[in-house]
Design a protein with these regions (language model features):
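Conserved G1/Walker A P-loop phosphate-binding module
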Residues: 1-51, 55, 162
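Conserved catalytic-core segment of NTP-binding enzymes
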Residues: 86-101, 121-127
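Canonical P-loop GTPase G-domain recognition
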Residues: 114-165
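Flexible beta-alpha connector loops of hexameric P-loop NTPases
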Residues: 47-57, 84, 113-116
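Conserved catalytic network of the ASCE P-loop NTPase/AAA+ motor domain
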Residues: 25-28, 33-35, 40, 68-74, ...
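Signal for well-folded cores of large energy- and translation-related assemblies
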Residues: 13, 65-72, 82, 99, ...
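Inter-motif core of Ras-like GTPase G domains
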Residues: 56-84, 96-108
Length: 165
């Protein structure tokens, strides 16, 4: 929660208010679909820290599970993680889930603007090492606020969405 999912969607789509942004963790409580050209960006509730009841958290878990288990083609999932912190047990559990269900995914490390230059390389390497065993295709260092890494992520997503020749 509160890693900047909605902010990154807005930045990727070049739209300021496409996804609702809040400073309070846990505000995304439903699955939100955003159609951009021929693709859908899907903003899911976060699975980490949020001041919500256990009942709400269980409902979010069911919602997310039902979304992933539905019979639909997912080109790629972008797991957003806060670049300032090491991957949590919840982060790794999500990677295990994605790997087990053969859902192709990449990791976008958010809030890179909050890191010192010297920390960026170290964090990127730590996350690459952590994510690799779970089939993570790539790790991107991003900042929705400054635009860092957004174009690289956008190009990767465009390539994933391109029709196969």
């Amino acid at each position: 929660s509160n890693v900047g999912k909605s902010s990154l969607i807005n930045r990727l789509c070049n739209r300021k208010n496409l996804a609702r942004v809040s400073a309070t963790p846990g505000k995304t409580a439903t699955i939100n679909f955003f159609r951009v050209d021929t693709a859908y960006f899907v903003d899911l509730p976060g699975y980490g820290y949020a001041k919500v009841s256990n009942a709400d958290r269980e409902r979010w878990d069911e919602l997310i599970n039902s979304y992933f288990e539905a019979d639909r083609a997912l080109n790629v999932l972008v797991q957003l993680l806060d670049s300032r912190h090491a991957p949590s047990a919840d982060d790794v559990q999500m990677m295990e889930y994605l790997h087990f269900h053969r859902i192709p995914f990449v990791v976008a490390l958010t809030k890179a603007d909050k890191l010192k230059k010297s920390e960026m390389t170290a964090q990127l390497e730590e996350f690459r090492i952590t994510c690799a065993p779970y089939g993570c295709k790539q790790v991107f260092l991003t900042s929705a606020e400054k635009g860092t890494g957004v174009e690289e992520l956008r190009q990767y997503l465009d390539a994933c969405l391109a029709p196969e020749a």
